Amino acid sequence: MIVQFCRKAGIPYDVYTFTNGWDNTTSDVYDLVEANDVSLHGVQCTHVLTSQCNRRVAEQDMCNLFHQAWKLSYSYSGANYSHQLSMGGTPLNNMLFGVPAMIHDFKVNNNVQKVSFVCLTDGESAPLKYYTKHNDKVYNEMVQWGKTFLRDGSRVYSLNTTLMTQSIVKYLTDKMPTVSITNIYLTGPKGSVQYAKENLQTSHYDISDFKKNGSDTITTTDGWPLICLVNPRTFKSGTEDIEVEAGAGKSKVRAALKKFLKGKSSSKLLLASLVDQFS
């Protein structure tokens, strides 16, 4: 749906998936790493959608992505799929370190200055991994407990091992102050309470808005600047496309998106958190 909005509004976009469901790391990669480097071993990042293609190719890409999801949901389906998009763990913490390079390339390729980074997840990240070397062999270790420091050039950041994802996002907001960062977290009522408490560092979270609307937003100062908690059941029905002419003005796109989401409890959330960022 976000891609549809970007296409109608003429906003460039790139969509990536990431998993550690399979590993194609070649041995020559280890010749380039140093001890204590953040590890990308086994992390598979796949570029699945982009605005830098014509309409026919873009729609075929979305169709292929749908086939992938259908196959993963219904294993008996005869739909074609790619094992590179197979489900696995969630190496979010490690993958976040690749975001600055992605955004740099995105700015160059699309000649843009303002960028919004939206990370959609449905679970917590696996522990952060880093490389170690022993007897000229490279190993992967997981950060578990104790103090962890991240060095980026001349800057050193302290990472909280109990709130690792939040610490990494805080590092990203400092490194990329002009980039809007949002986390869309798909979860049910119970998961929304747990996730909100963890990110707000509080013992209480009022779930009434989430239950009423199927979504809620929270803001933090020491992690994700904006978190959109969304119940995936919200997207069970609705029209399949945003009805607006290509190249329409922002007001028409906003109205069309509102109509598209009419009857969906997440409409207020998405309009407030995403459209305002893109405008």
Report the location of each language-model feature.
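Acidic, glycine-rich A-domain
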Residues: 1-279
